[in-house]
Amino acid sequence: MAIFSNQMRLSSTLLKRLHQRVAAAVNSSSSRNFTTTEGHRPTIVHKRSLDILHDPWFNKGTAFSFTERDRLHIRGLLPPNVMSFEQQIARFMADLKRLEVQARDGPSDPYVLAKWRILNRLHDRNETLYYKVLMENIEEYAPIVYTPTVGLVCQKYSGLFRRPRGMYFSAEDRGEMMSMVYNWPADQVDMIVVTDGSRILGLGDLGIQGIGIAIGKLDLYVAAAGINPQRVLPVMIDVGTDNENLLKDPLYLGLQDHRLDGEEYIEVIDEFMEAVFTRWPHVIVQFEDFQSKWAFKLLQRYRNNYRMFNDDIQGTAGVAIAGLLGAVRAQGRPMIDFPKMKIVVAGAGSAGIGVLNAARKTMARMLGNTEIAFESARSQFWVVDAKGLITEARENVDPDARPFARKIKEIERQGLSEGATLAEVVREVKPDVLLGLSACGGLFSKEVLEALKHSTSTRPAIFPMSNPTRNAECTPEEAFSILGENIIFASGSPFKDVDLGNGHVGHCNQANNMFLFPGIGLGTLLSGSRIVSDGMLQAAAECLAAYITEEEVLKGIIYPSISRIRDITKEVAAAVVKEAIEEDLAEGYREMDSRELRKLDEAQISEFVENNMWSPDYPTLVYKKD
């Protein structure tokens, strides 16, 4: 009965979220205005003349009115035609479209890099217009400012570098970081994305060039979550690089030393964390693309003391859980059947282990959260790494992967052995889901996909989640051509839907972390939660899973369109705030203290979130002497 009641409790939570998607929001006549943003009051600036035109936070370009041009001493420094926001966007889009026509028949890399350069130049001179363009064209430009193009940008960053963005802390700065943080001009920082460049996407050690991924992530925090761009900070911690090509490159911008390791490495990260939380006690720090060796250790070291999370581990896991729950629905099964799903996972790095741990916890929660439940959940996973199937017979198993090592007697009954190939495991296990987090492009070969034909599921799910595109374990064309149309396909990188003929379309879902991390960050910020708890992450994943309607699920759609990212983020953030309140972690945000926050119902929480999402609009600027 305990197991049944837990199943029903989880199921009812998800059903409630599904019903909320259908039900219209009820507007109470006595509803309060929960916004704590500045609104449309004039903004005081302490710059004039060329200084204001060279400041991307305040520069409006040709949109400055004549009264502002007089006030700010910029009359005559701009062309006389005062252009509207819409006209500026149209001019910028015309430039990009001309580039698209010129590059249509050329190689793809120069094309996307040229687009990135144009967007980056706009970012450097006018942040408001940049984010307006990005928000209004998010489906087209998210792949340019974020994955997959950001991977190419990081590889070429030393050559592309023109103007600094963010902060750089290095091994040479030991003992100085506490004072260095005061070199950043913003007195308030809400969100930091930090990397050490050791494992950028699936591209390996890119050293200091990895800051490109932190910049791209924060662009999405602004565009999707409405974090104020003046309160975000991309950070690179340069502890050296083991990339021999970079060490030999005279144009490389980072330290040309091998990476620090052991206690020396930990001391640098500790000093950084102490410094940023001393200056900005309420900041949220997202760790990004740290190698597996350190990702879990740093997460466990800091998560109970600081407002931080690791997107590669926790964000990827949440997106995968939402997709797996969607796959259960798409297979025509009740949500509580999730613990019965057989899942083969290719990849045992930080992302793979993060997904495994989250899926195991979700299954165990459905089964009653007992020791027996955790053991039962463990038995639903088969993990394959570069050496093959991981079993208890494996020597020197990574401690994080050890809980998922298969027992010898179990696999012998299945006709498998230690080190069995992925194709052999898929053929014998007949899984409901094949999940790829290996960063090994093409790993789901024809042999592997042919083996999946024997799945016991009537609609098997394939998740090649590795980024960037070249690291995807398979393409949708390969999957649909071998397995037919009755599959669920979700990838980490964007792919176009596949024309299957006869008017049928193979839907390509994108299992993109951007569906979750902006909402997790925004919800943590607005709740004032002391930490980012497992419950808050679970609430985010369940909210995303419930966002898709039954009609969409039946068509094989388990993730929403990126064009809806702003609304998705609002709902995810509201779910995170609600969970933080229920766990008694919420301490409030600015004027909304914890007592007022606890009085809000679900509709009011959603309103509170929406009212505190920054939107790109030009404020009236008024000059005041320092």
UniProtKB/Swiss-Prot annotation:
State where the protein is found: Mitochondrion matrix
Q: Which residues bind a divalent metal cation?
A: 288-289, 312
Q: Cofactor note from UniProt? A: Divalent metal cations. Prefers magnesium or manganese.
Cofactor(s) this protein cannot do without: Mg(2+); Mn(2+)
Any single GO BP term = pyruvate metabolic process
Matching Pfam families: malic, Malic_M
EC number of this enzyme:
1.1.1.39
Swiss-Prot/TrEMBL keywords: Metal-binding, Mitochondrion, NAD, Oxidoreductase, Transit peptide
Q: Which residues form a coiled coil?
A: none
Provide the Gene Ontology terms for cellular component.
mitochondrial matrix
Residues annotated for (S)-malate binding in this entry: 199, 467, 512
* Catalysed transformations (reactions): (S)-malate + NAD(+) = pyruvate + CO2 + NADH
Query: What enzyme class is recorded for this protein?
Result: oxidoreductase
* Binding locations of NAD(+): 199, 348, 351
GO MF term set: malate dehydrogenase (decarboxylating) (NAD+) activity; metal ion binding; NAD binding
Chain positions recorded as fumarate binding sites: 91, 125
Which stretches are transmembrane? none
- Entry's InterPro entries? Aminoacid_DH-like_N_sf, Malic_enzyme_CS, Malic_N_dom, Malic_N_dom_sf, Malic_NAD-bd, Malic_OxRdtase, NAD(P)-bd_dom_sf
Per the record, the similarity remark reads: Belongs to the malic enzymes family.
Identify the PANTHER family for this entry: MALIC ENZYME-RELATED, NADP-DEPENDENT MALIC ENZYME
Q: Which NCBIfam families match?
A: PRK13529.1
How is the subunit organization of this protein annotated in UniProt? Heterodimer of two related subunits.
This chain belongs to the protein called NAD-dependent malic enzyme, mitochondrial
